[in-house]
Amino acid sequence: MNPSSNIDGDFLIGPDYIPAPELTPVSGAPKGKTETFIMNSADSKIFPGITKVPPDGPANYVPPDLTNVATYPKAYKRTVKVYIPAGYVAGTPAPVIVVQDGPDKNLPLVLDNLIARHRVPAMVAVMIQNGGGDAQGSERGLEYDTMSGRYADFVESEVFPLVEKNCGVTISHDPEARAAMGISSGGIAAFSMAWYHPELYRRVITYSGTYVNQASPTDPKTPHGGWEYHEHLIPQNPTKPIRV
């Protein structure tokens, strides 16, 4: 199809989108279950909640200077959805994948299929909703684009204890049995979890991660934000036991 340059609108030029085969239910595949709970920012010592929108500002407020964004306290609630594979035996340390920007509606089906085909081990998936907003000055940006192990600390000390308490699972402490996964800012967050805490995570799925300078506030140790990984951190440090 060759639409005229004088016409505005949407044009379907193909090819047709074909869903991945992992999204098609496998006949006879055992189905895991999911549990859901809510976390309140008031209960968090690590991420009590921020926003870049002034209390009297419009919802679509854009800070005038993204290199120095003012922030304001803001409470939030986040949903955590936990996938538990079929046949899981309570008390058994389970491999785990931590998924940013959760909950993910397709992941339980994908894991059912992959586990049934023996392509991945039976694992628990912890799908964590971000704290809201996006980019510099937002709670999501603080959690995901900060160049530190702070988010991994949050998962370890505040999320995992609730997962084990509320969902009746035991999470493995073996870093080889732990993975972090994310897209965009969630992608760099997944990598940072392993980079700063390789004793906790050794496997990473990072899709279209924001390896650019979105960190806010600026840290003098990593002034270029996510650029620091390919600019300085990876080439100037010993190889880490991380599979990406």
Regions found by a protein language model. Name each.
Residues 1-244:
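Non-catalytic cap/lid and distal C-terminal segments of serine-dependent acyl enzymes
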